[in-house]
């Protein structure tokens, strides 16, 4: 039959949330690399190729290990099991993630008091995107978000502070970050 858009294309201009990402097969996760980089997904079926838009923000959640113990001292997994549990998240995929945040059980607890309504947050996000689009439009760039701006343009026309570049260069030289990682930091 005719190829149909999947989750990646349906998340176009939005968020693709993968819960329990470490449980997703490695080839599936690695299949996200091209759409994250190129902003589209290409499907080839029966001597026919279809391209669907796929510019999305990827958000993944994963426990640090299979037992998911809230208190690390109560974890039943050995170090090898913990390392293997997150091995589905390949280096090249991690390299395409803008941020990686580790939450402790206490930090992950949601405090309902003072919590904002989703509609209020959505309005702030929409306003921020409008400001970003106007800023880039003034520079002749057709981008709605910082993530869509070509890295070469950012390095040339909107360089980061010298102290930040010195730090990023040191991380790059030590192999703690890749050039793609440096570009991602500049876009943040």
PLM regions: where:
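Walker B catalytic acidic pair
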Residues: 13, 19-21, 31-32
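Thr-Gly-centered strand-to-loop micro-motif
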Residues: 18-19, 43
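Conserved alpha-helical scaffold flanking the Walker A/P-loop in AAA+ ATPase domains
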Residues: 1-16, 48-49
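Basic, amphipathic alpha-helical bundle interface domains used for macromolecular binding and assembly
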Residues: 2-3, 25-188
């Amino acid at each position: 039959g005719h190829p149909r858009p999947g989750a990646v294309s349906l998340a176009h201009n939005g968020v693709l949330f993968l819960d329990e990402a470490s449980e997703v097969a490695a080839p599936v996760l690695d299949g996200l690399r091209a759409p994250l980089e190129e902003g589209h997904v290409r499907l080839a079926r029966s001597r026919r190729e279809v391209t669907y838009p796929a510019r999305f923000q990827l958000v993944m959640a994963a426990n640090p290990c299979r037992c998911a113990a809230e208190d690390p001292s109560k974890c039943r997994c050995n170090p090898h099991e913990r390392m293997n549990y997150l091995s589905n998240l390949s280096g090249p995929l991690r390299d395409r993630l803008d941020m990686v945040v580790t939450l402790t059980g206490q930090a992950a607890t949601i405090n309902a008091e003072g919590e904002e309504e989703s509609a209020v947050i959505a309005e702030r996000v929409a306003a921020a995107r409008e400001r970003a689009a106007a800023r880039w439009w003034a520079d002749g760039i057709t981008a709605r978000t910082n993530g869509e701006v070509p890295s070469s343009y950012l390095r040339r026309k909107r360089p980061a502070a010298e102290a930040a570049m010195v730090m990023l260069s040191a991380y790059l030289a030590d192999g703690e970050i890749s050039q793609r990682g440096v570009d991602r930091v500049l876009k943040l």
